[in-house]
Amino acid sequence: EANRDFSMLTSDERVKHIITQADYYGYSGDKVKGLIFCSSIKETEELSAKFNQITNPAIGKLYRTIALNGRASEQERQDAFERLAMNEDEANEEKQPLDYIFSVEILNEGVDIVEVNQVIMLRPTQSPIVFIQQLGRGLRKANGKEYVVILDFIGNYTNNFMIPIALSGDRTYNKDNIRRYIMEGGRVIPGASTVH
């Protein structure tokens, strides 16, 4: 379905679905510290506002999220990154931890928030570079984080044969290996990772 209607991503039903799946697949650590990649500024703002009105089932409190885009100042970005990395016991009246940052136009590269334990992709891309950059936001090791959960609601990994190749870990670029990997559907990624 190349012509999916991405405007439906902000519907209440879709928001509930995203939250249900994010809760089901979970995260490593004491609390979620997630990045959500969106298609537009409007989408980040609407989704953040809707999440902030919903109770996080893991902790019984409203989600705390923020929408960030290219118009945010460097100070606003740094503040958001610090809040995302915070634990509950570090909260104070001035700063509360964030559960998610909704992002468009930024965070693909050059950002290092090692505590990120969940990445949600709501943005379509045909670019294996952008896909791997977004995926990579959660791949850094951190104390208390054993793994990262990547939820690709768009199915970017199926849209471009270069993405499964990038995920395969095979750097030989042997045509027979690539053909076999693509024909198998890349269901199992090397290591302890799977695609569902």
Q: What spans do the regions from the language model cover?
A:
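Short glycine-/polar-rich loops that comprise or flank the Walker A/P-loop
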Residues: 60-64, 114-118, 126, 143-150
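Conserved interdomain linker/interface between the two RecA-like ATPase lobes of SF2 helicase motors
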Residues: 1-38
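Conserved segment of the helicase C-terminal RecA-like domain
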Residues: 128-133, 137-171
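SF2 helicase motor core recognition
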Residues: 101-116, 136-140
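Conserved helicase ATPase core of P-loop NTP-dependent helicases/translocases
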Residues: 35, 45-46, 59-108
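Phosphate- and divalent-cation-binding pockets in alpha/beta enzyme and binding domains
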Residues: 43-50, 109, 130
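Long, largely alpha-helical accessory region at the distal end of helicase-like NTP-driven motors
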Residues: 17, 23, 28-29, 40, ...
